[in-house]
Amino acid sequence: MTQAAGAQGPLDFLEARILAVLIEKESTTPDAYPLTLNSLGAGCNQKSARDPVLTATESEIQQALENLRQRALVLETYGASGRVLRYAHNLGRVYALPAAAVALLATLALRGAQTINELRANSERLYRFDDSSSVEAYLEELATRNAGALVVRMPKQPGSREHRWAHLLCGEASLPAYQGSSACESSKEASEL
């Protein structure tokens, strides 16, 4: 496996969550996108459709946004009103990814490792895949990119029938420690040991 995130290095967990929230809200609430700091905080700390659930502070989110802005993964704008600073993602352009691949990465970063069928169902609001084989094709493409893999197919867990896929935006997924939580957390815990 090749580590993701290119020459800029891997993202931390909150940075990946912020990007995923921006991608999600671009599709699900287009009238409110780009997002304000408050709406981004609410999306990051949302209790539904998140694995794991966070309690990130405003200052933590601001620091992560600054890191993402320096990497050109987040853009700042003042929107139509010109009064409130708003944030938009730039992941697709930076990594040269189609919308389907961006949707899969966002879904994995929001909800943790998933099977192909779970990904198809959970990413439907972001991108409508024709069938499970098209999801698998995009995942294979993301796993074998010349610029570095952005996803990995995890080994089957005991008792499971299907492989799960995890994102590599935060670096290599820690295979033994990976039990459905975010690859970023597992990778971060391993690096702290």
Model-predicted regions and their roles:
Residues 1-20, 27, 31, 65-96:
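Intrinsically disordered, low-complexity serine/threonine- and proline-rich regulatory segments
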Residues 1-7, 116-124, 141:
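Core catalytic DNA strand-manipulation module of type IA topoisomerases
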Residues 12-34, 96-113, 139, 143:
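Positively charged, polyanion-binding regions of nucleic-acid-associated proteins
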Residues 21, 64, 138, 168:
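Residues in the recognition helix of alpha-helical DNA-binding motifs
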Residues 29-55, 113-129:
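Short acidic, hydrophobic short linear motifs in intrinsically disordered regions
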Residues 62-65, 69-79, 139-157:
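A short, conserved structural fragment
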Residues 80-118, 163-192:
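Short, amphipathic alpha-helical interaction segments positioned at domain boundaries
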Residues 133:
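Long, basic N-terminal domains or extensions that often function
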